[in-house]
């Protein structure tokens, strides 16, 4: 395991995946469209990561470079690399798929028959499987069988809070991250040897961990943000230190947790400890994480497979308590942010067609369901 191409040189790319790879002595080439960022990374070939938990420490990440992801350079790197990773955001996966497909085709053309593994590290369920579908659309059909044999598309679950850099910091490459991190990969999807990277955990039951993170960290995070916005709090820490919000977020995570316990057999006490750990992470005094960063793109977050509605569907499936999850969805409908196109679209829909039709459109819940009626009642009370 010698080198990797990582798409996305943003905060998560540099502060999480890129750092773990570099710490494992992998030479990392970042690929990004941000020209000044690429220029600085390729010039300096190192950057600082401020790791904040009970104490602060600054690590220097070395042996890195960068190329423009819209250039031929990145395709040439894919020809020779051992690993491709991404942290670009779910919406950008479809855009980079064409580049990855070109890289795979050129790799085969060059006679490189070494296995290649690709891991999308995104906040989405089975993100790499989605990426594979997009890559294959751009890959000549005659190469599909060979790609099936030699290219592993490895799904993963990732968890680390990486807020935007503080504006006062004069080093544009420095990134702040929390000390907690979790990167879990599906060991059944690799081709060839599984790379040994400290901090990358292997499992044969990925969905349990994907949903544990989605239903706990992501569900709790966005409900903290939406309830915080309604109370006028600016940051996640301010919001979670509000006793009423703390109690409701904890209750929401316990409601979604009951689904996980029934579905995957998680231990009740251990899952409650996991919830407490996440509440502690939200209150990290060193992380300035604004509610608007966590609350943005509410339409995506209200999707049937995302952090609010998916756990709700689980409570319906198992017949368990869901009152606070319903309130979280109602709070999401109240989210306003003029700089976020999805928030604007959501508010426009509420004005034009009302709560019931808006919920049906974006969540997939039936207009005549009890849940939609309850959410509407809660919405009117907020």
Curated annotation (Swiss-Prot):
GO terms for cellular component: cytosol. InterPro entries: 6-PGluconate_DH-like_C_sf (IPR008927), 6PGD_dom2 (IPR013328), Mannitol_1_phos_5_DH (IPR023028), Mannitol_DH (IPR000669), Mannitol_DH_C (IPR013118), Mannitol_DH_CS (IPR023027), Mannitol_DH_N (IPR013131), NAD(P)-bd_dom_sf (IPR036291). Its EC number is 1.1.1.17. It holds the Pfam family Mannitol_dh. One of its GO terms (biological process) is mannitol catabolic process. NAD(+) binds at residues 4-15. It is an enzyme of class 1 (oxidoreductase). Keywords: NAD, Oxidoreductase. Belongs to the mannitol dehydrogenase family. This is Mannitol-1-phosphate 5-dehydrogenase. It comes from Vibrio parahaemolyticus serotype O3:K6 (strain RIMD 2210633).
């Amino acid at each position: 395991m010698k080198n990797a191409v990582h798409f996305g040189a943003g905060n998560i790319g540099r502060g999480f995946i890129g750092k773990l790879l570099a710490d494992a002595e992998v030479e990392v080439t970042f690929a990004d469209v941000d020209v000044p960022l690429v220029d600085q990374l390729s010039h300096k070939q190192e950057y600082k990561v401020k790791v904040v938990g009970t104490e602060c420490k600054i690590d220097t990440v070395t042996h890195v470079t960068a190329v423009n992801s819209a250039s031929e350079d990145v395709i040439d790197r894919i020809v020779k690399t051992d690993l491709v990773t991404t942290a670009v955001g779910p919406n950008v996966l479809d855009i980079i798929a064409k580049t990855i497909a070109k890289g795979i085709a050129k790799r085969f053309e060059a006679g490189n028959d070494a296995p290649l593994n690709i891991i999308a590290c995104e906040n989405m369920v089975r993100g790499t499987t989605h990426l594979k579908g997009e890559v294959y659309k751009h890959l000549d059909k005659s190469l599909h069988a060979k790609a099936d044999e030699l290219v592993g598309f490895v799904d993963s679950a990732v968890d680390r809070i990486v807020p935007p850099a503080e504006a006062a910091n004069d080093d544009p490459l420095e990134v702040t991250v929390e000390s907690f991190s979790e990167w879990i990969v599906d060991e059944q999807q690799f081709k060839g040897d599984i790379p040994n990277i400290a901090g990358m955990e292997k499992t044969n039951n990925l969905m349990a961990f994907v949903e544990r993170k989605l239903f706990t960290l992501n569900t709790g995070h966005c409900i903290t943000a939406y309830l915080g916005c309604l109370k006028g709090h600016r940051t996640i820490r301010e919001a979670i230190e509000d006793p009423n919000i703390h109690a409701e977020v904890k209750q929401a995570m316990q409601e979604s947790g009951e689904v996980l316990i029934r579905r995957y057999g998680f231990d009740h006490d251990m899952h409650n400890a996991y919830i407490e750990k996440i509440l502690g992470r939200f209150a990290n005094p060193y992380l300035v994480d604004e509610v608007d960063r966590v609350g943005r793109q509410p339409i995506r977050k209200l999707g049937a497979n995302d952090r609010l509605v998916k756990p709700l569907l689980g409570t319906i499936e198992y017949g368990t308590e869901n009152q606070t999850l319903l309130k979280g969805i109602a709070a999401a409908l109240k989210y306003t942010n003029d700089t976020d196109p999805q928030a604007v679209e959501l508010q426009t829909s509420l004005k034009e067609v009302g709560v019931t039709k808006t919920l049906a459109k974006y969540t997939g819940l039936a207009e005549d369901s009890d849940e939609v009626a309850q959410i509407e009642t809660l919405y009117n009370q907020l």
